[in-house]
From Swiss-Prot:
Active site positions: E215, C249
Homology family: Belongs to the aldehyde dehydrogenase family.
Binding residues for NADP(+): 117-119, 143-147, 175-178, 193-194, 215-216, 249, 337-339
Pathway terms, separated by semicolons: Aromatic compound metabolism; (R)-mandelate degradation; benzoate from (R)-mandelate: step 4/4
GO cellular component terms given for this protein: cytoplasm
Name the UniProt record assigns to this protein: NAD(P)-dependent benzaldehyde dehydrogenase
GO molecular function: benzaldehyde dehydrogenase (NAD+) activity; benzaldehyde dehydrogenase (NADP+) activity; nucleotide binding
Keyword flag Cytoplasm: no
Length: 436
């Protein structure tokens, strides 16, 4: 994979600045045509994406169709259907102090944008922000993850087929290339990744007063109440925790269950894991050998009891689906976002305790999941735990709705996107007053 020199990166950045200045990207018809070209290029490279995602992350086709390609195509179709509505100026009243006048709000493009893609859903979480940049009327430079090289190469091919580089371009690379890109005066930056790198991005953006969106992560709790449907809960855990080998920013990071139903729940869960995820690579591949080693070290240090799993093969980047009971808040497994197929289990004795302990130890997660039949209690919990998003009796699928904003709060991120929210994120609200 060829990396560009700093001089060539600077040249590309300047070319995008010049192209944006022509205002070609502001034309609504141009934006729609760009979405159509992106859609066509993704479809034409579907088989290549299947192969690349299988190699990089061990993703089966059904997961790719749902959470990678399908998610992108659905987002494109939604934007095409609604863009005319979104770009229309919004008229507002003129108070007496500024009358007579006509007042309205328009959304203007930022300019040259920079999207830093992650490794875990490298197609969806790179191209969906790009859709926002396009519908906002911007140009865009994309740096996909260097840890998923096969998929990043296909993304570069898709972009090259769909767009001229002065409009949208991919720059491959690692830390050095990203550091140089972050030194440039972009008009907007969209980052998906870890909180530690997010801080670096924000510090770099501050030097140019560049607005940012940070899509980060955190330890998302799945809280199980005494009246929960245990079979439903296990179904959602099997999907949410172990898809993509646990490498999902909104995956349930830990299970926080009322003591009265813990044993019954774990009996069901462990049996399902043994039956449906019996192999060491049943959940897919971890992104690097280093990630396997990190998770193995945490398992070796835990004071909890492994109920199932914990088999690892570093060379295959594989770790079996693992459930660990008897975990306390100070356990190594609770020290950081796991981002792997390990489910620590903690128990609580009252709703008040559950709320207080989550807020104390891992506040403001990207998502909170509550399972129970009493909606007043369940809604009370999600109303008292600050989080990016929340669900009752379900996990993760809120991220597939273009009608819902997706984003974090505090350490789990800032800003949001999807659907109309992507358009709002990638544009500036401009107030206009016209005096007759």
């Amino acid at each position: 994979m060829n990396y560009l020199s700093p001089a060539k990166i600077d040249s590309l950045f300047s070319a995008q600045k010049a192209y944006f200045a022509t205002r070609a990207t502001a034309d609504v018809g141009f934006r729609k045509q760009s979405l159509e070209r992106l859609k066509e290029a993704v479809i034409n490279n579907k088989e290549a994406l299947y192969s690349a995602l299988a190699e990089d992350l061990g993703k089966p086709k059904d997961v790719v169709d749902l959470a990678e390609i399908g998610a992108v195509l659905h987002e494109i179709d939604f934007a095409l259907a609604h863009l005319d509505e979104w770009v229309a100026p919004v008229s507002v009243p003129s108070p007496d102090i500024i009358a007579p006048s006509e007042c309205y709000v328009v959304q203007e493009p930022y300019g040259v944008t920079y999207i830093i893609g992650p490794f875990n859903y490298p197609v969806n979480l790179t191209l969906t922000p790009l859709i926002g940049a396009i519908i906002g009327g911007n140009t865009c430079i994309i740096k996909p993850s260097e840890t998923t090289p096969e998929t990043s190469a296909v993304i570069e091919k898709i972009i090259a087929e769909a767009f001229a580089p002065e409009y949208v371009a991919v720059i491959q690379g690692g830390r050095d290339e990203n550091s140089h890109l972050l030194s440039l005066p972009f008009d907007f930056i969209f980052f998906t990744g870890s909180p530690n790198v997010g801080k670096v991005v924000m510090q770099a953006a501050a030097k140019h007063l560049t607005p940012v969106v940070l899509e980060l992560g955190g330890k998302c709790p799945l809280i199980v109440l005494p009246d929960a449907d245990l079979d439903q809960t296990v179904n959602q855990l099997m999907f949410g925790k172990f898809i993509n080998s646990g490498q999902t920013c909104i995956a349930p990071d830990y299970l926080y269950v009322h003591y009265s139903v813990k044993d019954a729940l774990l009996e069901r869960l462990v049996e399902r894991v043994k039956t449906e995820l019996p192999e060491i690579n049943s959940t897919g591949k971890l992104v690097t050998e280093r990630q396997v080693q990190r998770l193995v070290s945490l398992l070796e240090a835990t004071q909890g009891q492994v109920l199932v799993g914990s088999q690892a093969d570093v060379s295959k980047r594989a770790l079996s689906a693992t459930v660990v009971d008897g975990v306390e808040w100070n356990d190594p497994l609770m020290s950081e976002e796991l981002f792997g197929p390990i489910l620590p289990v903690l128990e609580f004795d009252s709703v008040r305790t559950a709320i207080d302990q989550v807020n104390k130890h891992h506040p403001k997660p990207l998502a909170v999941y509550v399972f129970g039949k009493d909606m007043d209690v369940a809604k009370g919990i999600i109303n008292q735990i600050q989080s990016g998003d929340a669900q009752v009796n379900g996990v993760m699928l809120h991220a597939f709705s273009p009608y819902l904003p997706f984003g974090g709060i505090g350490a789990s991120g800032m800003g949001e996107y999807h659907g109309h929210f992507s358009y709002l994120t990638f544009t500036h609200k401009k107030s206009v007053r016209i005096v007759p």
